[in-house]
Structures are given as structure tokens and as C-alpha cells.
Amino acid sequence: MTNLTPSLEDYLETIYLLQQGSNEARVRDIATARAVKASSVSPALKRLSDLGYLTYIQRESIRLTESGKIAARRIYARHVLLFQFFNDILGMPAEKAREEACGLEHALSDEGMDRFVQFFESRSLLSEPATNSSQDPQNPCASCPAHKTIPHTTLDKIADGHPVVVAQIRAKGAKRQTILDMGIIPNITLIRTASTHDGIRVNLNNHELFLSNEQVHSIVVIAHHTH
């Protein structure tokens, strides 16, 4: 995606988020979300249209093309990972974490993204440590908190309609990166919506994705539970 500047990536991401639950976004909605004048939105939309990332007719709604959706999901996945790290791990306030993620998401390489994913994967199947009040002078570790592995399974074993939280991606190399770039990363919620002979459809951020059988078998999930 070398033909996309950080600014154009931001526009794609904004449109993608506006289209959650809808297939449309309007110029004034984009301008409001980006805190810019409507007159500055049109040139960016025209450029994205020329590059094949969206369809745009003046005064009408904007729709992302398939390549536009792929590009938007890729950049948004990086944003979510970075936000999780700054907010959940480092304890940065949400608004500040969001600003940091917005600034860094454009520069995060595939390798950098994968390292963040590995970090969250290493945490995702561990429950909170259970405190052990016993003190054994012969075995100092007896009082150390012990983590328990959370029950998990792969996405192919989940019934349609059930929400799950992604824990790990077991695919390797380019196949793994393809899944990550779809936005399927640790701690996000998926809902399996339908099955076909060659894969399944899932709902992610109110957008529908198709996953092949091979991809489905490589996605480790935890059953979603509400509090």
C-alpha cells in the first residue's frame, strides 16, 4: 500500500468505522469525524477513488471497494493493537492512548505488528493469578501466584451465532499475516454468522468477513461471557 499516505489511510479508517452497521458514509459525517471542513474531504475521496479504494460520486454516499475494505481493516487492526498496548498494558488514559495509536499505526511494520500480537497471545489464555497465602520456607515459590489456562478451542468448533474472543492465531508466515490484516487479532470479539462448504462467515465490527476452512482451524478462541 505504498500509494497510500498516512492521511489517506486515516480517511479509509474513518470511513470503515462510519460504515459499521451500514454500507454508507457521507462527506459531512467524515468531516465531523475527522474534525475538518467538508471542502477538504472531497480531494481525499477523489484520490482514494482514483486508486480504486472507494466509489464516490459528489453529493452521494461513499462506499469502500473490496480493496478499500482490506486496506482499512489492515490499518485499523494496527490501531487496535497499539491502543490495547497503551491503554490496557501501560495504563495510559483512553484518549491519550488513542492519540498515540493514531500516530504510530501508519509506521508499524508487519514484523512489528506480529510482535505485538505474540505479546497479547502469550497473555490471552492465562487467567488472573490465584493468590497463595501459604508460606513454605523450603519452597519459596509455593507462595508465588499461579496462572491457570483458560479453556479454549478453535473457531471451527463454535456454533453459528455464538460470540467468541480471539486468543491466538496458529497460522504461520504470510497466511498468519493475512488473518491479522483482516483485523482478527487477540482480544477482539467475533460472531460466527453462517457456514459454507469451504469456510464460514463472521461478523467483526459489524462488517462481514469470509474465512476459509484452513483459516478457521488456525484461529483459537475463548467463549464470550458477559458480566
What are these regions (language model features)?
Residues 49-57:
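A short, conserved structural fragment
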Residues 2-36:
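N-terminal helix-turn-helix DNA-binding core of bacterial DNA-binding proteins
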Residues 39, 95:
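Key DNA-contact positions within bacterial/archaeal DNA-binding proteins
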Residues 35-36, 59, 92:
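The short coil/loop that forms the "turn" connecting the two helices of the helix-turn-helix
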Residues 32, 49-50, 88:
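Alpha-helical residues within the helix-turn-helix
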Residues 60-79:
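Basic, amphipathic "hinge/linker" alpha-helix immediately C-terminal to the N-terminal HTH DNA-binding motif
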Residues 105-164, 168-173, 199-203, 207-227:
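C-terminal regulatory/oligomerization modules of transcriptional regulators
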